[in-house]
Amino acid sequence: MLSSLIRDSFPLLILLPTFLAALGASVAGGVMGTYIVVKRIVSISGSISHAILGGIGLTLWIQYKLHLSFFPMYGAIVGAIFLALCIGKIHLKYQEREDSLIAMIWSVGMAIGIIFISRLPTFNGELINFLFGNILWVTPSDLYSLGIFDLLVLGIVVLCHTRFLALCFDERYTALNHCSVQLWYFLLLVLTAITIVMLIYVMGTILMLSMLVLPVAIACRFSYKMTRIMFISVLLNILCSFSGICIAYCLDFPVGPTISLLMGLGYTASLCVKKRYNPSTPSPVSPEINTNV
């Protein structure tokens, strides 16, 4: 009786788990998205997000064949980390053919996922959640897992920000300081893979890049300091995701596309606003500059 009265009086309270999940994904997406844009590995992130369908399909097939019940997110994370390490090795060893090899991993990963999914007896509703996102159905166990991964990503970023900063702007400088470029690059890609899986729960595989890239692109128009870009990106992610959830709930729209549209409108608006700094002001995506932290 009391719970129904509270739901009727404050309908948005039932969305509290959804807002918490969006908050965690927004923070991780804003922070890691900054490294991704500055390092110019957006295409790598896109290939991971789409090729991860292979890990999802394999996980669902194993669940069906062995009659197991476990969180599909774990299979997605294992697949994402494996793909990140493969792509990292490709980047470091075959840079001249990086684009073609990334496209190969992108398409092959999706093909493997589709093959495994086709072997399932019935269509699995969780697949739609991974493709298009369905944060409205987040469970307490989902929140715990997202919280753990969020703390893991942010903790490593706090400890290793200086190394990541040097890696993003000058790999040779990192090597000259007796730091393993391969180690730090792999770690950056692994954190990116974990963040991608977190964002998939909010936006889905198809629309995830809008939450990872567009807020950073907007922030780069108003600042060139990495920490400030991260802060602005996190705020934009929170604003767009919370607004998108409320709009989707009120208008009965899907949440992921609603958030993606808000991100796109925000980026379009930023293009129309006069830049606060002189056009000659260096941007963090320019590899030749020595940026402030």
Curated annotation (Swiss-Prot):
Q: How does it sit in the membrane?
A: Multi-pass membrane protein
> What does the UniProt keyword field contain?
Cell inner membrane, Cell membrane, Membrane, Transmembrane, Transmembrane helix, Transport
Membrane-spanning parts? 12-32, 41-61, 68-88, 101-121, 140-160, 183-203, 253-273
**GO cellular-component term (any):** ATP-binding cassette (ABC) transporter complex
Q: Which SUPFAM superfamilies match?
A: ABC transporter involved in vitamin B12 uptake, BtuC (SSF81345)
Q: Which cysteines are joined by disulfide bonds?
A: none
Q: What Gene3D superfamilies has UniProt attached to this entry?
A: ABC transporter involved in vitamin B12 uptake, BtuC (1.10.3470.10)
Q: Which InterPro entries match?
A: ABC_BtuC-like, ABC_TroCD
Q: Which domain of life is it from?
A: Bacteria
> Mind listing the GO biological process terms from this record?
response to zinc ion; transmembrane transport
Q: Where in the cell is it found?
A: Cell inner membrane
Similarity remark:
Belongs to the ABC-3 integral membrane protein family.
Described function: Part of an ATP-driven transport system CPn_0541/CPn_0542/CPn_0543 for a metal.
Name of the protein this chain belongs to: Probable metal transport system membrane protein CPn_0543/CP_0209/CPj0543/CpB0565
Q: Which organism is it from?
A: Chlamydia pneumoniae
